[in-house]
């Protein structure tokens, strides 16, 4: 049985549904507002650096199967030339978001590359420019320190020292930088967007809204 609409029926899906199922509210709601079958992915954020100190900023974001690092910084105040491990499998990281160029936020990016990371590194244009200087300089320090320590080790019979990363690692990582403008909405992956906002800490520094 069809129900007569109390008002003229316009040529729209909702009006047609109301005309056909006007008295059956349950059916009407299901047809007009069908239930969502796709569940939203859970966003999980893990603090794996600078959670108990200022330096070594590194945060691990998981959204479904997507894995993103926010910063990948070097700890300072320790012997920064000692080999360090990236706390997540580098080859599984899909992208990096970088807040600014200070080494305690960016200094382990070349090590991330050396261990297998090949994804994009998003940061502001000014941060990209500074990283091209600072990460090369950091790589030079790593290689120089390793050479100096190995000369000492050779005399004392100690083990060979391997730098955190090389200039080649730094240069290759720099090729993966993706410059972004402030307040630009960046589609990282389907359903994951980011926006950089100016915070005034350093040229190019930003807070990141996800």
Regions found by a protein language model. Give the residues of each.
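Intrinsic-disorder-associated, low-complexity terminal segments enriched in Asp/Asn/His/Tyr and depleted
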Residues: 3, 10-11, 15, 24
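Active-site recognition of the HExxH zinc-binding catalytic motif
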Residues: 100
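Short, low-complexity intrinsically disordered segments enriched in small and basic residues
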Residues: 2, 6, 26-28, 32-35
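Short, Lys/Arg-enriched N-terminal segments with co-localized hydrophobic residues
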Residues: 17, 29-42
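His/Asp/Glu-rich metal-coordinating catalytic cores
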Residues: 43-97, 106, 112-210
